[in-house]
Amino acid sequence: HQLEDVRDPGCLDHCDALILPGVGSFDPAMEKLHSSGMVEHLRSWHHNERPLLGICLGLQLLFESSEEGHTPGLGILKGHVQRLPEDQCERIPHMGWGQLRPQQPCPLLPDSETAPWVYFVHSYAAIPSKPSDLAATVAFGQDAATAMVWNKRTGACQFHPEKSAEAGARLLHHWIRWLESGAELPQ
């Protein structure tokens, strides 16, 4: 597999799959995507059902809006991003390990595996408008926060697979195997 750091929309033509990572804040990230000309290309990528994986802020950018800023999101997934509730027994930012609670079929989480523990660092969580887009949650106080979403060939995780040790590597391995097998839509 060949990896490429794509900073120009013209480079997308040569890609079979795309990872949208993100660290930082919603508005500056969206402004960077706008200034690089990537916004319409990312929307088209999803519309054409090409494989896309968002990570951390990359998950949040897929949604229509965020309480963290005023710039509209990509709108690839319907819903919004809101700050984690302050009234919980949890600290914000939510930092640490949490066990995924699968909600829907997703290529990253085979049914045969025990739900993994993964590492989170975030203060905001996505609220998908369509329940079918919610692939997994994680406990946050007495409630649950979105941990993974999946729609067609677009998926994303709020946690950091690269900081999640073997579990994170296994999730990325499942995504690569899914790509190699033809990126079939989840059943």
Task: Enumerate the predicted regions with their spans.
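Pocket-forming structural segment of enzyme catalytic cores
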Residues: 64-142
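Acyltransferase
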Residues: 154-187
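Structural motif
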Residues: 19-21, 156
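An anion/phosphate-binding loop that grips the pyrophosphate of nucleotide cofactors and donors
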Residues: 15
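Beta-strand-turn-beta hairpins that frame and shape the catalytic cleft
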Residues: 115, 150-155
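A short beta-strand-loop structural module common to alpha/beta enzyme folds
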Residues: 2-9
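Short, surface-exposed beta-strand/loop micro-motifs that present aromatic residues
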Residues: 143-150
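Cysteine-nucleophile active-site neighborhood
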Residues: 24-97
